[in-house]
């Protein structure tokens, strides 16, 4: 069987660790498929930084934030242990970001989603797991689906 390659958005990673989220179960299920090697997980270095920011923010984590050491440990063990492919930008990524920014009239903080999209477009990916499908559906070449949609496709 051909292992599906899933690129993860940061929101899915966060929900996988936030048991209070209504999105936790499906996000955690998708993450478990990576650890059981049923799918290949792909993330960007940007996801790691964004994940750290949220995990250490008490407002975002509803009073249950992690210390810097706890967040760094979780990230090291979960995402930097070799299970996930981590994608890094290069000069062609920046070119693609600028191209998309102009063609899609991207402004302000939306540039960060555009940067992630550019990284995904440069990666061999079957699906992009996100709960922000609407932010990405207009970008040709991406296949953004929610974790429940991906889980249904895989079953």
Question: Model-flagged regions — what are they?
Answer:
Residues 1-5, 114-155:
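Acidic, PIN/NYN-like endoribonuclease modules and their adjacent C-terminal/linker elements
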Residues 11-12, 46, 115, 134:
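Alpha-helix/helix-capping structural signal
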Residues 54-87:
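Helix-adjacent hinge/juxtasegments
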Residues 42-45, 130:
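Short beta-strand segments at enzyme active-site cores
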